[in-house]
Amino acid sequence: MALKDRFDKIISYFDTDDVSENEVHEVQERTSVQRDSRAATAQEASQRSHMTNSAEEEMIGSRPRTSTYNPNRQERQRVQRDNSYQQATPRIQNKDSVRQQREQVTIALKYPRKYEDAQEIVDLLIVNECVLIDFQYMLDAQARRCLDYIDGASRVLYGSLQKVGSSMFLLTPANVMVDIEEMNIPKTGQETSFDFDMKRR
């Protein structure tokens, strides 16, 4: 708790924006309540240890105790604390690995019909989703503009835009790697050859 309070004090030292008198009083009240609760807890602990010491003395009998310091007992308690910490740490690491395994990669399939749909596609890239874009329902000029916008956004967001079909592109975030072999795309009835530049060929 002391470490947490110290960090809170350090953070509050630098946080001077919008500080009011009420907030200052609330912080002071909280710290005084925390100090009081710590003092009460310490008193209870000392009373418990005193009670256990007196109970041990009664069990031992008339043999007087010269010192309350017991190095073996303190050593055992320290070892138990260390063991409990070491046992708790792998559990936390295991939970993180389970979360990563449970996360699934989703691929959104988009058929943009107008230039304004490009913003929706870029928004999906921002939240780290893969997007398969098919420009079959767009006019050639609009598709080129849309593709240029998406390509610029993917470069800014460190994404990747790859052509996977005659009118299809795969947009992936930086954390997704795609290995596409060279493939011959069959010519269909719709002749489209979008390129990343705005010039018409």
From Swiss-Prot:
It holds the Pfam family SepF. Its main location: cytoplasm. Residues 43-54, 82-92 have a biased composition (Polar residues). Keywords: Cell cycle, Cell division, Cytoplasm, Septation. The keyword Metal-binding does not apply. InterPro entries: Cell_div_SepF, Cell_div_SepF/SepF-rel, SepF-like_sf. Homodimer. Interacts with FtsZ. Cell division protein that is part of the divisome complex and is recruited early to the Z-ring. Probably stimulates Z-ring formation, perhaps through the cross-linking of FtsZ protofilaments. Its function overlaps with FtsA. Belongs to the SepF family. This is Cell division protein SepF. It comes from Streptococcus agalactiae serotype III (strain NEM316). The lineage of its organism: Bacteria, Bacillati, Bacillota, Bacilli, Lactobacillales.
